[in-house]
Each structure stands twice: as structure tokens, then as C-alpha cells.
Amino acid sequence: MFRTEISTTPHQHLITHQDSILTMGSCFADVMGNRLAENKFSVDINPFGTVYNPVSIFKLLSQAASNTSFTNEGIVESQGIYQHFDLHSKFGKGTKEELQAEVQQLEQKTTKTLADAKWLIVTLGTAVVYERSGEIVANCHKVSASQFSKRILSVKEVIRAYENVRNQLFQVNSGIQMIVTVSPVRHVKDTLVVNSQSKSILRVAVAEMTAFPEVSYFPSYEVMMDDLRDYRFYEKDMIHPNETAHDYIWEKFSGAYFDEPTRQLILKWQKLKRNLEHKPFHPASAHHQAFLKKTMEEMEQLSSQLNLEQEIQALKKEIL
């Protein structure tokens, strides 16, 4: 043995293609959300953009659950663009009114998504937070650092932030299941020492959160740190896990949250997906046209279990 493998056991509740899923949190929530979407799950991926600290994540969930509007005090103008301290930088408009309109639409959409979701996947990135006028912000939007104070959350603060939103979640969706993971992305900007402290706080907090019956923990952080445990599984920046690592973590996630029929369905779709990605030298040839027709038959058979309408319509255009 030259490594220590982390084994995952099937969760009490399992994800199916009939379930609606919402992911929120750090950029690893995007990674997991995109993997789910690629495999034909119904998923809304980080509707508020990437948010790294748990207080801001749970605040956004609270606002979505209660359909509470964002405060205008959080709006800031920087370099001619209006943004909100609770949201990712991608939400920016030329006027305050345009931003308010966009935020209102975002709130309404996410409130409905949360109400319909069977699963909420939350990825916590860091316990390091920035405060402005006593309020923790999700994003500083390149505003002068002099306007913020920086500190590290305590375990109690993280747990309290979830407790504050928990009742609201159940009021809007009594059957929701929550998967929490600590992001394996390293926050080296705050130094590796602080990153280690930050991840430890998040990990202890999540361990206590799993006392709530709706919360389960998926060990993506441990898989990266203690199972893969090698720089060849990182991107060139030595901060983000690479595609090989994502594949491996996804495999572990599948073992924990998908049953065997769901995994087999994913394998069938992946085979068809590779067929669709095939680029022939001679698209009009009899051989390729036969290949397309066979692929179409297989897709139509699978369409009773997965939503393949878009792919079927695109494939029809290629068949002569």
C-alpha cells in the first residue's frame, strides 16, 4: 500500500435524476454543480455567484428562504459599476436601479428554486471574513481595504449562522436534505498557516452541524488532502484541484449519494455524450449517418429517464 484511500458508504438518502438540486458556496460548488448538470441532473448552480465564507452563504439562503430583499446599504459603486457586497462581482450594472431590478429577479428565482429543491449542496471555502461597518461581506469588490476589517470566524459563529437559517429553510421546504463539504481549494493568499486554521474551523463546525438530521458531510477536503495527497492532482497554480482530482472526487461522491441504477444511467449517458462529441471527417458518409441513427435510437430510449430533448433536436439536424 502506497496510499491511504478514503472510503465512502451510501448515504441514508440518495440523489436521483428526478430530484431538484441547488448548490451554493465557493468555486467548488461550481465544480460539483457542473458535474451534476453534465450528467443530466436538474441543478441550479451557485445562483448568487461564488461565495466563500459560511456566514455570507447562510445569509443568502436566509434571504432566499424568507424572500427578503437585499438592503440598499449593501450597494456600492466602483469604477462606474454598481455592485452589492452580498453578491459576487459578476452581478454589476451601470445604474443602481438596474442592479436592484437584477437582484429582485435573482431573489424571486432562487426562492422558488429553494422551495422545490430536494437537495442543497453547500461548499464552505474559508473562515476568513471581511467586515464593513460591523457587517460581514461576501465580496469587497475592490473597494479600498481601509473600509474593511479582517478576522477569522469561530466555530460557534459558523454553527450559529446555520441555526439562524435552519427554521426558515424548513418553513419553505420541509423535506430538504443538505450536503455540506469543505472546499479542497487552498486559500494561500491568507498564508498556508491561516488556511490550515480556517479549514480546521470549518471542519469542526460542520462536524457539529451533522447533529442535525438533514445535514450530511461529504469529505472532499479529506479526499484531496489525505487520499490523493500529491501535487500532480493540482492545477499549475498549486491551489485548485485539477480535472483528475475532480474525476476522483466525483467518483467518491457518486458512491456516497447515487444508487446502482443511477450510476448505470450515468454510464449510459456518458457513452452517448461521447458519441455526440465525435467530429467526423466525412459527416455525409453512409457510415457516419448510420452511426448517427443508431445514436438517435439509443437517445430516444434513454429520453424516458433523462431530459435529452435539446440533444435529440440537435442530432436531428445532422441526420440527412
Predicted regions and their residues:
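Conserved catalytic region of serine esterases and O-acyltransferases that act on ester linkages
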Residues: 252-320
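Extracellular serine-dependent O-acyl
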Residues: 177-179, 200-230, 252, 266-267
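A solvent-exposed, charged loop/short amphipathic helix patch at secondary-structure junctions
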Residues: 132-155
